Amino acid sequence: MGRGNKTIDKLMVKTIFEDNILIPLPKVFVENRLFPLFSIISPTHCDSCSAKLNVNSHYTRFILTSYGTIARNTKYWICPNCNKSFHDQIVGVTGSANYSDEFYDKQNFVRYDGRCSLNNSCRIGERYTEGLTDICGRAPCASSLWLHEQKQASVSKQELLDLDSDFDGTLYIDGDWVKIGWKNKLETSICREITSKEWKKMRYRSVYTIATKEKVILDFEITDRLPTIEALIPLLTRIKNRFPEGKIKKIVSDEDKAIIGAVKLVFPEVVHSFCVFHQLKNVSKRYYDEFESVKNIPENDKLVYKEICKLIKSDTIIYSVVCFQNILELESNLELSKASHKAISYAKEIFEKNIAFLKKGFTPETDNTMEQIFSLIGDVVDKARSFKTESGLTNFCYNLFAHFNKRCFCTGKWVGFSPIMRARFQYG
């Protein structure tokens, strides 16, 4: 959704009739037919013996929805031949649940878009249903939301794995740390207390994600904190089997040894680039810490700054060596600030590292696709704080990534488009 002032959408205006607000209910597909939300679908014949059903009893169900609490008169049916019981189906309500599916969906949007924990998602739901479902409002509790999240994960998993998104031939892979585990339960199982130092090492996991330039997330793998090459091979193999041979032309990652080794084994013929965006960011940070803005950097220091950036972006060993020699000359001939001396020390560290990658055939890449994705994902994960089990984290990731693939950009030239829509618009 776009930001700032927008004109009022008059198509969404509600009418007031006899002191009541009239809200037209949306229609949803049930078995390839459209039905108004919360309408009743009654069974007619037994699914076992095909006999016509008889009414057994009447029952009024109260459904908690984002529109308020809705009462629906339903019937229970019985087969006269085999005594099998049936009941009416309320469109938009799964089984005998007290909450409607759309209410659960809105709570999930609150959780992911609002970067909320399960408990905070419940509190927000209570706020926007004040006077509708209860005096203080009522929303699915943390346990109900968690259970709904686990069920929804199977749908999200299929969406993610069946996603047929076109791209420009370049894929981006990176990992980020998340916290997981239940300390008290683990201590009980091993019959001893775990120190804080041990717990910090034990509770971290890494979520490795593969995405396109359009920020469409294709797949992920949860590994140990510092994974081996073998831990990432299943993820890359799934991606290799998903696309025709020759479709993937380049893979971009950071200097992670596990990624480099796994890519070399699974994609030996594909060009592998290493992302230098974070190197550029680290250099810039040293200057921003001292001068706060590029405009405030003295001319001598600007020369050093530009030369270090050229060094980082160098795509040949010769050009990289030339840039490094220029930096050393500037260091010896010019009066420089502390920021420049810190930046030059950092440049000396990364020079040898980048040369080693260039010798192996790697090329530098300045695209910050994965940094943008993980800055968003990391914000959600930090505030979710609900990962007691690995299966819970896996299901959360399936839901989160499927949600972000369909979530529209709020800023930039692609505002109003989701990553999937952007990919379809660009590549058809």
Label each region the model flagged.
Residues 47-48, 81:
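Short, cysteine/histidine-rich loop/knuckle motifs that typically chelate Zn2+
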Residues 2-3, 55, 78, 85, ...:
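RNase H-like nuclease fold core
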Residues 21-35, 56-67:
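Short Cys/His-rich Zn2+-coordinating modules
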Residues 79, 107, 121, 125, ...:
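Short, conserved catalytic/metal-binding motifs centered on acidic residues
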Residues 2-3, 10-11, 15-16, 25-28, ...:
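Extended amphipathic alpha-helical interaction segments
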Residues 53-113:
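Basic, short loop/linker segments at the boundary and entry of helix-turn-helix/winged-helix-like folds
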Residues 87-126, 130, 134-136, 141, ...:
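Extended interfacial segments that mediate partner engagement and assembly in macromolecular machines
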Residues 32-43, 67-73:
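Short, flexible, mixed-charge glycine/proline-rich loop motifs
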